[in-house]
């Protein structure tokens, strides 16, 4: 396995670790509605940081974006909006199925759809079937899916042992939302594929290869921001129990506390895709679809490890932890299989 591929896998791991940890600061926000908290963090992660970093990277910010036709920018934006819809559905999936089943189904579907649809759309799927390296990467995707399933099973055992239930369990509604979440969340993978002309243009301007994907986030995350912020603002305006004014009428120290934590959560959320871009840059072009598989499977891996570190599994008993550990090992094996496949 080449150093470039190894570093690509490593950066995807770092990005996934940030994704697994980003919600921790949000959990410490006090007396704010979820909508206010999510909006503050989202403005940082989806608008301020993408724009600021792109302004630093590009020699002429406005000239870069104005050089693209609407036919280039619109698919990137719409796939970003598609991802935004998946993001909203994620929370609803957890409500109706519970954390473990919801995450397992949603992540499993988005891993398959986001990974395999890209080469199908690009007409390259036959290369995966007819080459040794392609078959190895497909095997890695299958093994990763098995790993996600094992971790999901561990979560179910933990919830059963600790008496944790879904907020409003509804299997039919939950499954529909989980499938929608999985499909729509893959929009980020499709957006990165559609944004290749933007990456190439950034490279032509002399932007370092590690950073060429970052300017496209202005458009991708702009699409996601409209969906997420629109959802939050509509609820803040229409739901009687929610009030943006009330949330910002608290004691000044508490407002500062909440803003800083929300900003930190937004920063950590953005960093997952900052390092995703680094990892994506190191993956061979013919296997760039694997970036999504690495990100999603490592997200599950890191989520399990973070749960152990935070002692969330302390009262779950030995069996759930053993199953979780097995799932994590399987995901690590999957990453190595994919790495070997890409090297071939």
Swiss-Prot record:
Its record classes its membrane topology as:
Multi-pass membrane protein
Spans traversing the lipid bilayer: 4-24, 38-58, 68-88, 101-121, 137-157, 175-195, 214-234, 259-279, 290-310, 323-343
What keywords does the record list, in alphabetical order?
Cell inner membrane, Cell membrane, Membrane, Sugar transport, Symport, Transmembrane, Transmembrane helix, Transport
Domain of life, per UniProt, equals Bacteria
A Gene Ontology molecular-function term?
symporter activity
CC terms in the record's Gene Ontology section: plasma membrane
Q: Where in the cell is it found?
A: Cell inner membrane
Q: Does the keyword Cell membrane apply?
A: yes
* Pfam families noted in UniProt: RhaT
Q: Which reaction does it catalyse?
A: L-rhamnopyranose(in) + H(+)(in) = L-rhamnopyranose(out) + H(+)(out)
Q: Which residues form the signal peptide?
A: none
Q: What does this protein do?
A: Uptake of L-rhamnose across the cytoplasmic membrane with the concomitant transport of protons into the cell (symport system).
For this chain, the family text in UniProt reads:
Belongs to the L-rhamnose transporter (TC 2.A.7.6) family.
**Official protein name in the record:** L-rhamnose-proton symporter
| Lineage, highest ranks first | Bacteria, Pseudomonadati, Pseudomonadota, Gammaproteobacteria, Enterobacterales
């Amino acid at each position: 396995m080449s150093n470039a591929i190894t570093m690509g896998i490593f950066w995807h791991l770092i990005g996934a670790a940030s994704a697994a940890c980003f919600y921790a600061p949000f959990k410490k926000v006090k007396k704010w509605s979820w909508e206010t908290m999510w909006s503050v963090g989202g403005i940082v992660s989806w608008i301020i940081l993408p724009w600021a970093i792109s302004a630093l990277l590009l020699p002429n910010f406005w000239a870069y974006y104005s050089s693209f036709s609407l036919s280039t920018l619109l698919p990137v934006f719409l796939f970003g909006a598609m991802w935004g819809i998946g993001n909203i559905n994620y929370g609803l999936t957890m409500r109706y199925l519970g954390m473990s089943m919801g995450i397992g189904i949603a992540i499993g579907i988005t891993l398959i759809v986001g990974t395999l649809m890209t080469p199908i759309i690009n007409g390259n799927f036959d290369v995966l079937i007819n080459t040794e390296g392609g078959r190895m990467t497909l095997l890695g995707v299958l093994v990763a899916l098995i790993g996600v399933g094992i971790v999901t099973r561990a979560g179910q055992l933990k919830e059963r042992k600790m008496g944790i239930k879904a907020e409003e369990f509804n299997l039919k509604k939950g499954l529909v939302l989980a499938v929608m979440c999985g499909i729509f969340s893959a929009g980020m993978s499709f957006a990165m594929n559609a944004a290749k002309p933007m990456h190439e243009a950034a490279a032509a301007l002399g932007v370092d290869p590690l950073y060429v994907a970052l300017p496209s986030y202005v458009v991708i995350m702009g699409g996601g921001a409209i969906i997420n912020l629109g959802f939050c603002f509509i609820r803040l305006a229409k739901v009687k129990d929610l009030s943006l004014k009330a949330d910002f009428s608290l004691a000044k120290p508490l407002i500062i506390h909440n803003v800083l934590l929300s900003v930190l959560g937004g920063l950590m959320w953005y960093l997952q895709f900052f390092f995703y871009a680094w990892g994506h840059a190191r993956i061979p072009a013919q296997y760039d679809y694997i970036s999504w598989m690495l990100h999603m499977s490592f997200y599950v891996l890191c989520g399990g490890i973070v749960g152990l570190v935070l002692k969330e599994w302390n009262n779950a008993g030995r069996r759930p932890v053993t199953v979780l550990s097995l799932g994590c090992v399987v995901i690590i094996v999957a990453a190595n299989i994919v790495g070997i496949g890409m090297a071939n």
